[in-house]
Design a protein with these regions (language model features):
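Acidic, proline/glycine-enriched N-terminal capping motif
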Residues: 1-50, 59
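Acidic, low-complexity central loop/insert segments
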Residues: 2-11, 51-146
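Short, conserved charged micro-motifs
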Residues: 16-21, 71-75, 104-107, 127-132, ...
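Short amphipathic beta-strand starts and helix->beta connectors
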Residues: 40-52, 83, 104-110, 184, ...
Length: 267
């Protein structure tokens, strides 16, 4: 079990909590049963992802996890749209979130949520837990499952499909309106998504800040890609989560950033 200090949790309560989240987020919250969880995007009116969220239902309440660097701003923005909705929400400072293997036994003093689209499980608890792993190990698993939480430097830069969030159940194309829904749907049905997520690995240690541009050698041509997230695992190498022009047949052979030029590897 690994404590995820880069995430925070907010509680949404009140008779309209579910319908409010349904109207604001890209996932179909209305079909979420108690004890279940789903990823969702909170998007700008232009369809760009402000933050990835994990929505966990507990009875008539919802625990919503998101990047600590973004969640306070997300809640402030959501507060502008409460109007007459009977919903209250606030960050739960005493609640922590842990990552654990899906096959691990239930933990004491908390609720485990397993989003169906990924092979990951999250424990939300306000009680101490015995953590025995590193955040980098967990981030490696998340990136390999197409989960990246975004940061201020990458917020409002990409529509959900560019990040592959439609592949982790974070976008419903059959639900009603939400901010940016028209643009997200149009991009899907008109085939206008020209950039997609691409994992790039190298056996070397390569530190690249989110939002920075790297170059990839694909089919003997250098093309630019934007780094969304990355992790370095000792004795393993670096894994970069990038958004790059879609070229399914062209696997990168080299990655270049500044003075660094490395062979791509498999992690």
């Amino acid at each position: 079990m690994i404590e995820l200090s880069f995430l925070s949790v907010a509680r949404f309560s009140g008779p309209d909590a579910g319908s409010f989240l349904q109207a604001q987020l890209s996932a179909d919250i209305a079909v979420l049963a108690s004890g279940k969880a789903a990823f969702a995007c909170y998007c700008s009116p232009r369809g760009q992802v402000i933050s990835l969220l994990l929505v966990c239902r507990e009875g008539d309440e919802y625990l919503v996890a998101g990047a600590s660097a973004l969640l306070p701003a997300v809640l402030r923005r959501l507060g502008m749209f409460v109007l007459r909705s009977k919903v209250e929400f606030a960050i739960q400072s005493g609640m922590k979130i842990f990552g654990q293997a899906v096959e691990d036994p239930p933990s004491i003093g908390g609720s485990v949520f397993k989003p169906e689209a990924v092979g990951l499980a999250y424990l939300l608890s306000d009680q101490p837990q015995l953590a025995n792993g590193s955040e980098d190990d967990w981030k490696l698993m998340e990136l390999n499952n197409n989960v990246t939480w975004l940061e201020p430097a990458t917020s409002e830069k990409f529509i959900p499909q560019m990040l592959g969030f439609d592949n982790i159940g974070a976008v419903s194309f059959s639900k009603g309106c939400y901010p940016g829904q028209e643009i997200v749907a149009r991009a899907r049905y008109l085939g206008k998504v020209k950039r997609k997520p691409l994992l790039v690995a190298t056996a070397q240690e390569l530190w690249v800040e989110p939002g920075q541009t790297i170059e990839l050698l694909r089919a003997e041509q250098w093309t630019a890609a934007t780094v969304v997230d990355s992790v370095f695992v000792r004795d393993t190498g670096t894994l970069l989560f990038t958004v790059a022009p879609e070229k399914p047949e062209d696997t990168p052979s080299r990655v270049r950033y500044g003075a660094h030029d490395y062979l791509c590897a498999t992690i």
